[in-house]
A protein has these predicted regions:
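Ser/Thr-centric signal marking residues that sit
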Residues: 6, 46, 138
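Histidine-centered beta-alpha loop that forms part of the nucleotide-sugar donor binding/catalytic region
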Residues: 10, 47, 143-144
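Substrate-recognition element of Asp-dependent hydrolases with the DxDx(T/V) motif
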Residues: 28, 32-65, 81-88, 131
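Conserved protein kinase catalytic core
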Residues: 8-10, 53, 129, 161
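Active-site neighborhood of HAD-like aspartate-dependent phosphohydrolases
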Residues: 1-43
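Asp-based, Mg2+/Mn2+-dependent phosphohydrolase catalytic module
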Residues: 3, 59, 63-80, 90-120, ...
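A short acidic, helix-capping loop that chelates divalent metal ions and anchors anionic groups
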Residues: 15-17, 51-55, 88-93, 147-148
Length: 163
């Protein structure tokens, strides 16, 4: 799953400088719970180019992520892991979505995961493109177009009826 704009509020880049607490989108906690109840593990894949572009520090990112995970855990939901790309948009790294580096890292750490049993949910074209590249079920929150394995939804809450 993507994080910003999918599970929590997203902001214009500069506004992230002053954000210290995650604001969860309406219904996102309940949606995570339904995904877990259906037997799925939850892995977060997030582009965090704001780190390399000096808008936020790695410490700010980690503090924010710790609060994000704690809030979810306080609701009885376990997140298996969070993988992030800290590189700038100009870096041409292999881990920034839609490239597959974050997925490869997650599969290296969790070799028992079979990609064909996975799905991707995100609110940006890079999330949809990643899912298409991987050939897995992909949910675009208000983005993309229905083709192949891509399903357009209004929010994370809509995913449970498709999985």
């Amino acid at each position: 799953l993507d994080r910003d704009g999918t599970i929590i509020e997203d902001y214009e880049d500069e506004l992230w400088r002053n954000k210290t607490e995650p604001i969860f989108l309406v219904g996102s906690i309940e949606a995570l719970e339904k995904i877990k109840q259906k037997g799925y593990e939850i892995i977060i894949l997030t582009n965090q180019y704001l780190i390399d572009e000096k808008i936020i520090s790695i410490e700010q990112y980690q503090d924010f992520t710790d609060k994000f995970i704690k809030r979810i855990k306080d609701n009885g939901i376990e997140i298996l892991d969070v993988f992030y790309c800290p590189h700038s948009r100009e870096s041409n790294c292999s881990c920034m979505k839609p490239k597959e580096g974050l997925v490869k890292k997650s599969l290296e750490k969790y070799p028992e995961i079979d990609l064909k049993d996975c799905f991707i949910v995100g609110d940006s074209l890079c999330d949809v493109e990643l899912g298409k590249r991987l050939g897995i079920k992909t949910f675009g929150i208000g983005v993309g177009k229905k083709e192949g394995e891509v399903i357009i939804i209004d929010s994370l809450g809509d995913v449970a009826s498709y999985i």
